[in-house]
Amino acid sequence: MSLLEQLDKNIAASGGLIVSCQPVPGSPLDKPEIVAAMALAAEQAGAVAVRIEGIDNLRVARSLVSVPIIGIIKRDLDESPVRITPFLDDVDALAQAGANIIAIDGTARQRPVTVEALLARIHHHHLLAMADCSSVDDGLACQRLGADIIGTTMSGYTTPDTPEEPDLPLVKALHDAGCRVIAEGRYNSPELAAKAIRYGAWAVTVGSAITRLEYICGWYNDALKKAAS
């Protein structure tokens, strides 16, 4: 059974939750052993996969979890706005660290390495390739280039203003166009995640609402302050 077939089976049985285990940078939780513990807890709670950033985090998580890992490396580049897995060496390192799926930025922006070359390198390692996209055009272009999975990860993050709500219409449009879609980005409640499935998502990635304690505390603090004013 292929990894996609196994994921199809697990998603049908469990509902399709993917947990992104990416603490706030510099947080007390931003340690490989804690990231790995989050990943294991997510697996034990029914997540069908986890998303992990960074080689050290991935290596430790790989030693603990059996569910597929979506691996990424984030970089801040002077010459490009692309942050997610921008280099071929990043793909190689993620493959060696134990990723099952490697995600790249799939947007049509200036970049050091083409999307086509990155996808080909992922497939060279016999791994699944995921493209984090911001629009229907991005998603369809990446699908034509061979991406196995299209994520809505970048919707709202390539423009000056980021909306509060997730981009459900993008999920539907990509699904209707024949893409295997992972809904990702601002799915901060179970209700929104369920909506994504109804809009055609294959699975839903949730990060901040599960693994970023500072964000969650901030939401509660803001609500309590408003209630008290």
Swiss-Prot record:
Protein's GO biological process: carbohydrate metabolic process; N-acetylmannosamine catabolic process; N-acetylneuraminate catabolic process
Keyword check for Isomerase: yes
Listed SUPFAM superfamilies: Ribulose-phoshate binding barrel
Reactions listed under catalytic activity: an N-acyl-D-glucosamine 6-phosphate = an N-acyl-D-mannosamine 6-phosphate
Cross-referenced CDD domains: NanE (cd04729)
EC assignment: 5.1.3.9
GO molecular function, one term: N-acylglucosamine-6-phosphate 2-epimerase activity
Coiled-coil regions listed: none
Pathway in which the depicted protein is active: Amino-sugar metabolism; N-acetylneuraminate degradation; D-fructose 6-phosphate from N-acetylneuraminate: step 3/5
Presence of keyword Membrane: no
GO CC list: cytosol
Keyword terms of this UniProt record: Carbohydrate metabolism, Isomerase
HAMAP family associated with the record: ManNAc6P_epimer
Chain's role: Converts N-acetylmannosamine-6-phosphate (ManNAc-6-P) to N-acetylglucosamine-6-phosphate (GlcNAc-6-P).
Entry similarity comment: Belongs to the NanE family.
NCBIfam families in UniProt: PRK01130.1
Protein name: Putative N-acetylmannosamine-6-phosphate 2-epimerase
Species annotation: Salmonella arizonae (strain ATCC BAA-731 / CDC346-86 / RSK2980)
Record gene name: nanE
